[in-house]
Amino acid sequence: MTETVVVGISGGVDSAVAACLLMKQGYRVLGLNIRILDTPDEHPSLAPSPLLISDHADYQFPVFSLNLSARFSQEVIRYFQADYLAGKTPNPCMVCNKKIKWHGLLEGARLLGAERIATGHYARTASLDGRVRLYKGLDPQKDQSYFLWMLSQNDLNKTCFPLGELAKEKVRELARTFGVRAAEKKESQEICFVPHDDYCRYLELAVPGLKEKVAGGDIVDENGKVLGKHRGYPFYTIGQRRGLGLSSTEPLYVTALDQENNCVHTGNKSSLDTRSLTVSGLNWINNKSLDEPVEAFGKIRYRDRETPCTIAPLPDGQATITFHTAKHAVAPGQAAVFYHDEEVLGGGFISAVNRDR
């Protein structure tokens, strides 16, 4: 019997090529377009979608839509706002992957009677010793494994990544061969629900009275000396230099955001370096838990370079991470993700940063 795969269809070139590759390999493909910015549907259900992915008759397949706007608002937008109001720097894409995309795809597969799901992410999986391992995509410029650390064994067990061993240039080439309508579509780097990628303006409009509540707090130096007033701690980011409105004999950078005292801390560039941080919400992909310290390679942002670190478990899904060499401008709210060679071991959200002195 032909195996059925539900493919997440975003409208971009990657998901379209992933679907076409699976069709070429003999799978029965059904597309699922998850709607996240529509009018919320109180009882989400599958509906036929008019999306046509390819102009080539051999690569046309049914596409369904699933309105998860209410869930997206609850799980992603509220998280995004809450993290900024807590003085953190959120990463909504990885939360969306876990709480929206995989949730929706697995539900779609259940409703459509499909055995597997697939996405256009540049990542790979393999089964070993009865468990699924997650690996980097082979194209180092497009590897998206950093954004997938929250996935569970249940998520990965039914997932395939058709683009995991391909370079972006090859995907574009295949898109033209398959007659994909989005073959020349440019990639978007913006957060989908933040117009013009201006998160400050978004927060001002989304959170009534925010500007009045947070404006006028102190900007202080490393000794606690007041240097000036800020326009609201949520509107600053760790490592920021421009836009502080300060005059100083040396460049000053934002080193910490203190929500409790409505304070923005600053220091010189070296004060942004740290070797120690704490993560929470730890997800250890291949093992059920982390029981003892392990050595790994870690990164603290998408384009960061992985460097050696020691991961020591703490209670309640937390861990202390000690890097062998300093990381720069570590921001609470971002994710630390851990690797062994090409394998993604797991990750967690950065909850505290211990500055080196």
UniProtKB/Swiss-Prot annotation:
Q: Where in the cell is it found?
A: Cytoplasm
**Alphabetized NCBIfam families for the sequence:** PRK00143.1, trmU
Gene this protein is translated from? mnmA
Q: Where is this region: Interaction with tRNA?
A: 142-144, 301-302
Role summary? Catalyzes the 2-thiolation of uridine at the wobble position (U34) of tRNA, leading to the formation of s(2)U34.
| Organism superkingdom | Bacteria
Which catalysed reactions does the entry list for this protein?
Answer: S-sulfanyl-L-cysteinyl-[protein] + uridine(34) in tRNA + AH2 + ATP = 2-thiouridine(34) in tRNA + L-cysteinyl-[protein] + A + AMP + diphosphate + H(+)
UniProt-annotated site: Interaction with tRNA, residues = H121, Q334
Q: What class of enzyme is it?
A: transferase
In the record, the note on similarity to other proteins reads: Belongs to the MnmA/TRMU family.
Name under which the protein is recorded: tRNA-specific 2-thiouridylase MnmA
Q: Name one GO cellular component term.
A: cytoplasm
A Gene Ontology biological process in which this protein takes part is: tRNA wobble position uridine thiolation
Which E.C. number(s) belong to this protein? 2.8.1.13
Q: What is the species listed in this Swiss-Prot or TrEMBL entry?
A: Chlorobium phaeobacteroides (strain DSM 266 / SMG 266 / 2430)
